[in-house]
Amino acid sequence: MNKTLVLLCFACFVITNTVFAQNEPVRIAFWNMENFFDPFVDSTKTYNAFTEDGMQHWTKTRFYRKRNNMYKAILAMSENRPLGILGMCEVENEYVLSSLFEQTPLKKHNYRWILYEGPDNRGIDPAIVYSLDHFQLVESMVFPYYNPEDTAYHSRDILYAKFIGADASSVAYADTLHVFVNHWPSRYSGELETVGSRSCSAAILRAKVDSIVVAAPEGYQPKVIMMGDLNDCPTDPSVYDVLRARHPSELEEGCFINLFGKNDGLGFEGTLKHQTDWQIFDQIIVTPAVMDDREGLHYKEGSARIFHADFMLEDDETYHGKKLFRTYIGPRYFGGFSDHLPVYIDLIGNEE
């Protein structure tokens, strides 16, 4: 075979594989990690239940088991490829992220992360993990929770990051991607008693996304992904009315698209279970531009899923069926994963 033919074959191989890589789905996921604490005492915080001498007797052995459980689930969810973006909540600090993404087989996927220490009284915050194989970080910041009717109450920040594609010159990655990670106020004090605080978080998120849309150049529709544990179902007022996030079958002018708005083809009953009822608190919501398949990265139709590997579940002997294999239930240690299942969608680029 002469040199010209060899070079031609090599060029064809490179072009073919580049196009294929650009059109492989990019998985975007979210997971509530449930109390992902390190085992060390933090003298700057008043909450130290998750330490060796604390109420939960959180030892190094238990921490490493939790970490290893999480990396196995993430590898399974990503099908052993790098996730494009993984939003997380209930993350204590940089140490647990470094341990998870630099000291396990996840290290091969070239992840980086974003975490800001926030006002949560337990010291747990949202985080964004992203693959340098897929995205470059442009900027990040947090938007604090603020309720003018109850200024004494503090809740978790909303984490924001702006990305461009790792290969910004390619058609598949030409667009900017805006990502918001949420962990709205819990129902711990009662659903009705706390509905206003979640509506407040929804209003903050809506205002921030609207500001991105308004500031965009004429004729350009920003691609925004909102994800998180909203502590409300898709039809609850905070999500449906305040954020105005609707299932694609219920869209109205000015609405965002809740890809988890109905349990229609999501692959599982819900993301968390209360007695006999599965609910979808963990959701991924997008602006209409993410659904536009004419240019750049866009939603792969039908890809929204609740990830539920068998090893993340166990038999529910009280309420029947399956339940989540958790790390703790109250003070009792079980050595499992989380009290939430992760969710994901796939984005795909245009063929050239």
What are the roles of these predicted feature ranges?
Residues 33, 91-176, 180, 184:
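Structured beta-strand-rich core segments of catalytic domains in phosphoester-bond hydrolases
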Residues 4-15:
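Sec-dependent N-terminal signal peptides
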Residues 19-110, 114-124, 312, 316-321, ...:
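N-terminal, active-site-proximal structural segment of metallo-dependent hydrolase catalytic domains
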Residues 153, 210-224, 232-352:
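Metal-dependent phosphoester-hydrolase catalytic domains
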Residues 35-42, 170-172, 188-189, 293-295:
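Short, solvent-exposed loop/turn elements at domain surfaces
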Residues 44-47, 175-197:
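Active-site His/acidic residue clusters
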Residues 54-61, 82-88, 115-116, 147-149, ...:
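Second-shell loop/turn segments in exported
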